[in-house]
A protein has these predicted regions:
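Protein kinase glycine-rich loop
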Residues: 16-22, 27
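Flexible N-lobe loop architecture of eukaryotic-like protein kinase catalytic domains
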Residues: 20, 57, 66-69
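Conserved N-lobe loop of protein kinases adjacent to the ATP-binding glycine-rich P-loop
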Residues: 31-38
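AlphaC helix of the eukaryotic protein kinase fold
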Residues: 45-64
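Activation-segment/catalytic-loop signature of the eukaryotic protein kinase fold
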Residues: 76
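Conserved short submotifs of the Hanks-type protein kinase catalytic core
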Residues: 80-94, 98
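Activation segment signature within eukaryotic-like protein kinase domains
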Residues: 112-113
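Protein kinase catalytic-loop region centered on the HRD/HxD motif
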Residues: 118-130
Length: 153
């Protein structure tokens, strides 16, 4: 189901617009009316039993991760048979877009690499280890403060 801007889910999350779509789901920018913050809302686009199980597992797993280079998951719910994850909205531009616009200095690239090594080390040392499976420039967002965040689990 495609969510239109202005749609309200659970009388709490107001859809502002679509951020992107991947194989597993669509991600929307939304506004949490309760907490008065912007969030990212991921919709499971494959509502079959295996996909639903995997989506719920992802929600539980990510909700327990706390790291500055990873978004936090703050809610998971089912509405009219459709599953949703709510997570931090990460402000900034993805590296794929950024790299197409300007050259990158060695010091910037090293800082970003350091951020990713820290995030991956954190993920891989969990019990059980968390594997991202889709690390690419489009899934790395550069925040205004210069830190990189790994998104789209």
């Amino acid at each position: 189901m495609s969510l239109e801007p202005g749609s309200l889910l659970r009388e709490r999350y107001r859809i502002e617009g679509r951020l992107g779509q991947g194989g597993m789901g669509a991600v929307y920018r939304a506004y949490d009316l309760t907490l008065e913050i912007e969030v990212a809302l991921k919709e499971n686009l494959n509502p079959n039993p295996e996909s639903e199980r995997q989506f719920k597992r992802e929600a539980r797993l990510l909700a327990n991760l706390r790291h500055p280079n990873l978004p936090r998951v703050t809610d998971h719910f089912v509405l009219e048979g459709q599953q949703y994850l709510v997570m931090d909205y990460i402000e900034g531009e993805d590296l794929q877009s950024l790299l197409g616009k300007r050259p990158v200095s060695v010091s910037e690239a090293l800082h970003w690499a350091d951020d990713m090594v820290e995030a991956l080390h954190f993920l891989h040392t969990r019990t059980p280890p968390v594997i991202h499976r889709d690390i690419k420039p489009a899934n790395l967002k550069l925040q205004p403060d210069g830190n990189l965040v790994l998104v789209d689990f």
